[in-house]
């Protein structure tokens, strides 16, 4: 059994060369790194221990030209300012941009809710946008973005629903909220469930909103991402969505969302689309006294008797969308709409 160890730090100090975990060791996430705050917040046992920081609701990675945006949370400052996947943020107020130190200039974080000027490169166009960060932990931000993503739209004579589950948690409140979000889409002819760039845990109760026989997930030697930490979730009423559903995944879908996509895509009415997930279903523990997490792969965990760590899920319909391909539309989303219209 792999055990998740909570890390609680205060008064962290940061350097200018911060980036996401993709640019550091694959097995360690430093506190100089935006991903550190995502892991810390989701692994904390209560709201008081989650570290808040000033941020604008982006994920990304450091490149020579600047910070490459890989995703933008709905309803957050970057989204409201019109920033898109594939944009490169080159500077903040004329200084090199860093997603952590750029908005958190003091070692002990405190709200800095003032407007900042970003220089952004989109293809060959360089432009500026003003953003005012929010001061919030990333657990709350990802959960809020879940709700903000909800939409319905007409496609031909059909109604398609859309929901991006940015973060999955195991609290009863969040399990019920996901069920309520799905209920708002209950009358749709089909739903696009977006799990791209998503993170979090998985309980069998997450499957209740999609599967009638949700308890049949076959996991051996389950690590902390699956083991339930609450006693009330099992009493949540099951009223699963029974119509066609397209699930979007990519190489940045990590942890519980990977298994959610894997388990639900077994049904003929549910189709996965996008690019392969990384198979990152292990756990994190504090790296000694340092401000970092070490990643422990779930090498002994088996899903339906098969090794999943480092392998991940290959979507039924593969459609790569490289970050280097900058476009105004979302080809994976558009393909999901076309796919649903062909089966509903």
Label each PLM-derived region with a short phrase.
Residues 1-8:
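Sec-dependent signal peptide recognition
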Residues 18-21, 26:
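Boundary at the C-terminal end of the N-terminal hydrophobic targeting segment
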Residues 25-71, 130:
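PDZ/PDZ-like peptide-tail recognition elements
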Residues 51-91, 95-98, 170:
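PDZ/PDZ-like domain segments forming the peptide/carboxylate-binding groove
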Residues 78-101, 191-193, 264-267, 272-273, ...:
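Conserved PDZ fold ligand-binding element
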Residues 89-93, 163-164, 184-200, 248:
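Short acidic catalytic loops
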Residues 96-188, 312-321, 326:
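C-terminal, low-ordered peptide segments at domain boundaries
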Residues 172, 180, 198-248, 252, ...:
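Gly/Ser/Thr-rich loop/hinge elements
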């Amino acid at each position: 059994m792999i055990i998740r160890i909570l890390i609680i730090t205060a008064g962290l100090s940061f350097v200018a060369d911060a980036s996401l975990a993709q640019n550091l060791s694959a097995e360690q996430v430093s506190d100089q790194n935006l991903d550190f705050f995502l892991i810390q917040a989701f692994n904390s046992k209560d709201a008081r221990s989650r570290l808040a920081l000033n941020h604008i609701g982006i994920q990304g990675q450091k490149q020579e030209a600047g910070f490459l945006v890989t995703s933008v949370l709905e309803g957050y400052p970057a989204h409201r300012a019109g920033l898109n996947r594939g944009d490169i943020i080159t500077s903040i107020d004329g200084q090199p941009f860093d997603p952590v130190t750029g908005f958190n200039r003091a070692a002990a974080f405190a709200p800095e809710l003032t407007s900042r000027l970003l220089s952004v490169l989109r293809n060959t166009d360089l432009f500026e946008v003003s953003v005012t960060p929010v001061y919030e932990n990333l657990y709350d931000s990802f959960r809020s973005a879940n709700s903000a993503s909800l939409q319905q739209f007409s496609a031909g004579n059909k109604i398609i629903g859309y929901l991006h589950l940015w973060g999955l948690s195991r609290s009863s409140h969040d399990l019920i909220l996901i069920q309520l979000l799905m209920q708002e889409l209950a009358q749709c002819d089909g739903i696009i469930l977006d799990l791209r760039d998503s993170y979090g845990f998985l309980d069998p109760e997450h499957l209740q909103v999609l599967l009638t026989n949700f308890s049949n997930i076959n996991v051996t030697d389950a690590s902390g991402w699956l083991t339930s930490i609450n006693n009330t979730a099992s009493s949540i009423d099951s009223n699963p969505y029974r119509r066609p559903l397209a699930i979007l995944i990519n190489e940045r879908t990590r942890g519980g969302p990977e298994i959610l996509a894997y388990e639900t895509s077994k049904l003929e009415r549910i189709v996965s689309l996008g690019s392969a997930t990384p198979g990152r279903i292990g756990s994190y523990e504090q790296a000694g006294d340092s401000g970092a997490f070490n990643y422990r792969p779930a090498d002994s965990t088996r899903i339906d008797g098969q090794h999943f760590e480092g392998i991940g899920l290959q979507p039924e319909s593969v459609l790569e969308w490289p970050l280097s391909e900058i476009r105004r539309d979302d080809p994976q989303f558009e393909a999901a709409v076309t796919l649903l219209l062909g089966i509903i």
